[in-house]
Every structure is written in structure tokens, then in C-alpha cells.
Amino acid sequence: MDLADIRQTIDGIDTTLLNSFVERMDIATEVAKSKIEMGKAVFDPARERFKLNNLASRAPGRYEAQTITLFRLLMSMSKAEQQRYINELKGITVSQKAHATAVAFDTPFPQTATVACQGVEGAYSQIAACKLFNVPDIAFFETFEGVMRAVRDGFCEFGVLPIENSTAGSVNAVYDLLAQFDFHIVRSLRLKIDHNLLVKPGTKLAEVREVYSHGQAIAQCAGFIEGHGLHATKYPNTAMSAEMVANSERTDVAAIASRSCAALYGLEVLEPNIQDSDNNYTRFVVISREPRVYPGANRTSLMITTANEPGALYRVLERFYALNINLIKLESRPIPGHDFEFMFYFDLDCPFGSKALDDLLDSIDDVCESFTYFGSYTEVL
């Protein structure tokens, strides 16, 4: 057979496969009906294991692993379709609930607003807020929770908080507070972070014994700190550490903060750009009490809890794969008061209102114990 004949044979096989696939997916509705009548869950692990083992044993040895992969994917798509059908029978699907909850705006993201930030003048959160809003009216709070409370109580319309760094990882406290306050993300920003060693005018590097800054900044500058034998002390905020050094009577202390803090607090930039990586970015999010969705929103954040059993997270990820949804980020956090149980945060490359997102929301009921929609938004680069 020449290549043209081989391709013609493959086309015929693919047509047969397609027809069989459609027939298999169509029968998923009948499976769902039977499971409803019998009071059975969509996911039957014992049946699935038996089926996969049986199919693998019937496949030629060289195709055993591929057979399991193929049919596991088919089963995942079938379960997603079964769950979608069951949700439709309930009268309102998860995606419909998300649409009903979210407030879609036809107007662009606001240029000015009252915004809560953690820290004091010169904080990176302030710099981020000024990039996210043209004319923000900023109120400062000492803690991340203070920012959350200001938004909850209506003192500020939005809050701006750091959520992850390219070097030091996630800001876990912010993830925990998002779940605690049930707030929503309406915008995000990737901000280039350049850390500087700030001292009182005239101080030499050899005189510095102790450096103060936020824990994330200390982690991002670990190489410099260790290389110079400095003792690092955590402080609530980078700008607050600069203010503290400026007001201190000690001359052997320094702060790690933004260059703008030097001018604000009368300090000197002793060493610029001391972060370990030049590719040092922090991602900030704008939080709101309402799940506002502004035009152009193309990123979606979810929180899911699963059963505390082997394979529980895999079954969720399986649905993303089956529906061809790109997972940008996955973060796990322990559930307070529940030993060795976790909640999972997902960032998806998936616009609000898209069929892919709706299909996902309507198909994960059976593989998660709880589900929270954190919002759909645009990330500013």
C-alpha cells in the first residue's frame, strides 16, 4: 500500500471510531437515567477499575497502557455528560447558578475607586493599585485581614492584595482569607518587583547587621542576605519596614523595600536590585464583595474541596483534560480544623460564559464535595 491508500484506510477507521464515539456519548444519558432510578452515584470506582482491567487484558501487550489512557478519557467524558444531564433535571445547573450570581458589566473596569491596601505609603500594593486604577483613593491597613474587613464593611469598594510571587511562591494567607470572607477576584496584575537595600544616609554595608522586610521579600532576597551574613527579621510590610528603619535610633539596620520608599522616608539606596532573580514578579489581585465580571474577562478562579481519599483530585483534573481546559495554576491549602484535608484553588484559561467553562461547572458535582466560584477577570501584564 502506498501512503495515499494507507491514509484512506485510516480515514475509514477514524469514521468508524467517530460514529462509535458519538453512539457511546449518546448512551451516557441512558446510563444517567438508570443511575437516578437505582439511586447510584455517577462515579462507580469498582466498576471503573473492573472495566479498565478487563479492557487492558484484552489489548495486545504493546498497547495495554494506551488502552487504559484512551478508555479512562472516554469514561471521564461520559461521567461529565451524565452529571450535566442530572444537573439539568434539577432545574438549575451549576453554571446557571454562577451566571445568576455574577454581575456582568458592560462598562470597562473603573479608572477610580476607593481601594484598600496593606502597609503604608510606598508599599508594593500601592504601586500595584496605581497601575490598576488611574486615580485610586487609597486607604492603608496594617494587615491583609484589615484590607478584607474594609471591603466587607463597605469602607472601600475594592482591595488590592499580593497573591503569588514568581520566586517565593504563593501568599498563603491571602488564599485563606479569600475562602474565609467569600470574596471575589475582579482583576489581576503582574508587577515587576525590584528590591533595594535601604539605610540611613551615610551607612556603609559593613555596618549593617540586621535587615527588616516582609517575609516574601526576605525569601526573594535570600541569596544577598545570606551572602552578606545579615540577620533577617520579618516585618508586616516592606514599606512599613522602611518607615521603621527611618525612625529607628540604630545605625546597623536596613530595610528591603521599593526605591520610592527611600525618597518617602529619607533613606538611601545602599544596594539596588538585590532580589535573587531578575525575573521577579508578584501577582496582585483586586478583590470585591460582588463577583463583578468586566468586559474581556478571560481568566477564571475556582476553589474545590474533594473527598479525603486516593484519586479524588485526579478525578477533578480528569474533567479539565476531558473538556480541553487549560489549567494555569493549582494551589492546595489545608482546611482549617480538618487534619490532612485540603481545599484546591484553580486558575483556568477560560472566559466567563464560554461553553467550556459552563460544561466544566456542570460536570464536577460528582467529583467534589464543595465548589466556590471566585470570579472571572482580566490579568494586566
Regions found by a protein language model. Give the residues of each.
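Domain-level signature for soluble enzymes in the chorismate/prephenate branch of the shikimate pathway
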Residues: 1-381
